[in-house]
Amino acid sequence: CNYCTSYFENIDKVLKNEEQLKPIISKIKFEGRNKKYDCIIGVSGGVDSTYVAYLVKKLGLRPLAVHLDNGWDSELAVSNIEKTLKKLDIDLYTHVINWNEFKDLQLSFLKASIPGMEIPSDHAIFAVLNKVALKNGIRYIVNGSNFKMEYIMDPDWSEFIGQMDWLLIKNIHKQFGKIPLQTFPRMTRWNVYYTKFIKKHTVINVLDYIDFSKEK
């Protein structure tokens, strides 16, 4: 199919190798040498983020793990996250979203009938990761997004298109929402510009540098 063809045409441009990862890890360690943490990682309790937590410790980094509780966490999922991070000796910060606001926003997206139903969660996650990075003076955010697992998808169904578009989220909620979003984490265009170009936040898709396979 055309998505598979596009994947194989672009895979060599995106995927890197462990030798290319080494100088990045060295730079993260050097810049964070006088800080408690040298990078931020997002944890959901899923396979990808759990492996990233294991990998960054194996690489000798000192991460602060950030988890977003959007109201859908189960007790088992929370327990798994806490046990995993305790085993790896990684500190955890959990941001709990106002459930009434988030529920109203999710209902707004359902009523809008757009494909990207996870846009509100993805946006909030990225906003919280950058907020925690700013608070701790950390430049590097290491995540579990990866080309191999996520590229073969109809672009029109991908949350990546709108997950950073606060205007889209705000306008959908303005049309369909019933309560104000007073505390919902957000990344305005200014926030994006400030974190990326002034504070130089850098996202490392670390799984693109290694031979990562869920089957293994």
Each model region followed by its residue ranges:
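Nucleotide-activated chemistry modules centered on ATP-dependent adenylation/adenylyltransferase
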Residues: 1-38, 54-216
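Short, glycine-rich nucleotide/cofactor-binding loops
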Residues: 39-48
